[in-house]
Amino acid sequence: MRTDTTRGPLVAGLAVALLASPAALAAGPRDCAGLAALAGPDLWIARAEALPAGQLPAENPGRAALTGAARTQAAMPAHCVVEGMIAPRQGVDQRRYGIGFQLRMPEDWNGRFLFQGGGGMDGVVSDAVGAIPVAGATAAPALNRGYAVVSTDSGHQGFDSSDASFGVDQQARIDHAYAAIGRVTETALNLIGAYEGRPPEHRYYMGCSNGGRTALMAAQRFPTLFDGVVAGNPGFRLSRAAIAQAWDVQALNRAAPRDEQGRPILASALTPEDLQLVSQGVLKQCDALDGLADGSIDAMSACRFDPATLTCGAGQTQSCLAPAKLEALRSVFGGARDGQGQSLYSTWPWDAGISAPGWRAWKLGTSPTGTPNARNATLAAASLGLYFMTPPKPGLRLAEVDFSRVAAQTAQTAAINDATATLLSSFVARGGKLLVFHGNSDPVFSADDLRAYWRALGQDNGGEADLARWARLFMVPGMNHCGGGPALDDFDPLAAIEAWVEAGRAPEALPARGGAFPGRSRPLCAYPLEAHYKGQGDTQDISSFECRPPSP
């Protein structure tokens, strides 16, 4: 592998200083337990242990839903694991804070380093194995490929990844927004250098959801740290997405039946049959636009669905949408707006994935009572009130959000949290590569919003062709948040970014499969190209499809 000579002075200086330090010299190469000697006032090391090859426990299902990195029990290679905390301190609320991390370094190291992104509001340190952050992926985790992998809680310790109570602390907000990326990377590189006796030759960042946001942050705010960045379903404009989630809850509650206490039952605003009706309506209108009616809308740009076609006629009560439900859908898909009708968040694309369990889990939930369990409702209430709003509003109820004021209330955190920058000249100049993927049926972060950002990124970077030299976007038809839905959600973005960075092979398309369509393979085309059936050949095989520009 090539050695990159364009490293910034910060990283180079840290590596030299560490390798020359008495503690590092005392530890010696491949002395895992000896890494504990690197602890100091600003670095706690709770564990430094050499582990034999074994089995990795399965990811917590709730956590996996936030990161996409679902996995069954997998074989784990022999490796050194280090766990600790950076910059421990006492916060303004008398809580203990610090940036927790876990680093795993395999015995058969390939010279690569991966920063594994988190999900939700973070607050927990996930197993640093580098699982591919898309639910259907069958590709091996990065650790099994020989990567050294680090993970973090982003600077606070929560009861789970929906806990936003850290938002009352200024430094905790900053750490979660972006600063933990730099601190954890610095520490991980120091530990790798001490253990291996040399720094990594290539450095990568990969995550989905909030981990996708921090992946973009890695490229935008730390442009000299990473060679390649993979951002999946990124919550890049998360402050506005949280507002949109409040908007959606209010819109859907207006169509929902009430419980005995008069509370709206969010999960019943739209039944599974309602969503299946919409999905079938979208497929009927748009499925064949890519040359083949097969349950997947690859010609996403050409799909113009009007839900009014599903309106109940006089005396009709089945296989149609009542006016209140139709209005709720129009409000949600039209995007959040303020009191003057100005857009607060993007529109959403109509796609077949609306009927999938993942869409319902985020937008509606399954609770039969007036206490909702939709992930958007539970996460947004906490994050909007405690993290995004200044001053914080504990106990915020989404039904009380004032859309004429909420943009101003969230502006301060948006300025440090949202990964909306389009000037990435330093990242590009040192050869950085960016690969982004996103589900067209994501119910959390709108695919329309990401497409708008991508167009702006192209406009500010010399146009579409120049942008494609260092950044590629791959839209996944039917896919929900970080996987799931009627989609081909089994692909390997880590292999693609690695080949691009190290061998110069830019990905024109990502080969994809998925459990929703057994035996099928398709290309996920680099945006704005879309997959089309050639008109002949096996309709289940990737070779029968080509990437074409969208129809004018």
Spell out what each predicted region is:
Residues 20-24:
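N-terminal signal peptide c-region/cleavage motif recognized by signal peptidases
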Residues 2-12:
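Bacterial N-terminal signal peptides that target proteins for export
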Residues 207-211, 215:
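Gly/Ala-rich beta-loop-alpha elbow adjacent to hydrolase catalytic centers
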Residues 217-219, 224-337, 475:
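A catalytic-pocket lid/entrance helix-loop region that shapes and gates access to the active site
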Residues 26-112, 125-128, 136-137, 279, ...:
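Catalytic-loop region of hydrolases
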Residues 436-438:
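Short beta-strand/loop motif that positions the catalytic acidic residue
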Residues 110, 118-197, 243-244, 251-252, ...:
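Cap/lid segment of the alpha/beta-hydrolase catalytic domain
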Residues 444-448:
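Conserved alpha/beta-hydrolase "acid-adjacent" motif
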